[in-house]
């Protein structure tokens, strides 16, 4: 294995949220789906994520993506999301920033202009974009199906004590906390 690895990246942001698209030096990932490839990446190549997302090349809010050929020929491309917290199954702002960069820089070539079928580890995401000349002006995505995964779970926290929460899925799992006796609301923190 060579002692030096070179990656090409293009940085952008989505309303201030950073996204770094790795455009060169991407390794082969084993797996038949993006979910399997994500797992392989996390188990064998996480040094790439930490090297590109953390200081001195990144920062604590850095997000990024890597583009791959699709597994299904009906789709336009596949994507792996990397960030400081790990490899997300789906990332909304990362999708918007990546599509903008990828279309403007010619990294992906849509089968149907203005519309993309993107394979993410979370599943198929449909993307519409508007372009004026070479500039992408807007990106709209239809995410994977959302669902309520758990309702009324009781958890114990060090700072707040017992809380009742719901867990929802929308490409990632999210904890939903309504105001309650131990938690009056985010505006108090």
Q: What do the PLM-derived regions correspond to, one by one?
A:
Residues 1-166, 175-189:
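A glycine-rich beta-to-alpha transition motif near the start of alpha/beta enzyme domains, typified by
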Residues 171:
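Glycine-rich ThDP/TPP pyrophosphate-binding loop and its adjacent helix/strand module
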């Amino acid at each position: 294995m060579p002692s030096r690895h070179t990656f090409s990246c293009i940085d952008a942001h989505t309303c201030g949220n950073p996204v770094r698209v790795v455009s060169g030096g991407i390794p082969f990932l084993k797996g038949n789906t993006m979910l399997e490839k994500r797992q392989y990446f996390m188990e064998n190549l996480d040094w790439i994520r930490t090297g590109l997302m953390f200081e001195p090349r990144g920062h604590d809010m850095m997000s990024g993506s890597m583009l791959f050929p699709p597994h299904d020929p009906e789709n336009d491309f596949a994507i792996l999301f990397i960030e400081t917290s790990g490899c997300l199954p789906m990332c909304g702002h990362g999708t918007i920033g990546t599509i903008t960069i990828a279309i403007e820089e010619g990294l992906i070539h849509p089968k149907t202009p203005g519309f993309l079928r993107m394979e993410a580890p979370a599943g198929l995401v449909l993307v519409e974009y508007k372009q004026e000349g070479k500039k992408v002006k807007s990106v709209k995505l239809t995410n994977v199906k959302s669902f309520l995964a758990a309702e009324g779970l009781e958890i114990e926290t060090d700072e707040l004590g017992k809380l009742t929460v719901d867990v929802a899925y929308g490409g990632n799992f999210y904890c939903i906390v309504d105001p309650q006796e131990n938690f009056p609301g985010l505006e108090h923190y």
